[in-house]
Curated annotation (Swiss-Prot):
This protein is one of the early assembly proteins of the 50S ribosomal subunit, although it is not seen to bind rRNA by itself. It is important during the early stages of 50S assembly. It comes from Lactobacillus johnsonii (strain CNCM I-12250 / La1 / NCC 533). Keywords: Ribonucleoprotein, Ribosomal protein. The keyword Ribosomal protein applies. The keyword Chloroplast does not apply. GO terms for molecular function: mRNA binding; structural constituent of ribosome. This is Large ribosomal subunit protein uL13. Coiled coil: none annotated. It comes from the Bacteria. One of its GO terms (cellular component) is cytosolic large ribosomal subunit.
Amino acid sequence: MRTTPLAKTSDIKRKWYVIDATDVSLGRLSTAVASILRGKNKPQYTPNVDTGDYVIVVNAAKLKLTGKKATDKIYYRHSDYRGGLRATPAGELLAKNPVRLVELSVKGMLPKNTLGHQEFMKMHVYAGEDHEHAAQKPEKLDINELI
């Protein structure tokens, strides 16, 4: 009986992808990015091995929030001091720090362990169109083809 071949970290060839977030909803962008970071788009996907690729997200400031998420979706953080709970609506976070909004959204879709942290570190988000990874020769990905 043949067994399923499992991927090894040394056998994986990683690619670099650029995704343009202009006029794309936050959830659709995040699910596509999380899937690529996990390696679920590859035939040799193995859940306990980091098989994913690198992702560069550009124009994060131009993504859109659908419905009433700009006012109703709240992101919380705590300073570890009494009364230190801070709440920021998604619309305000998009205006002030769109990179953080995309990072929080994608991070919530990855595993909460060391493997998820390794996968998260392969994502690079930029608010504008310029990025500093031209030397890696990233391929452009159309988000509409992934969904």
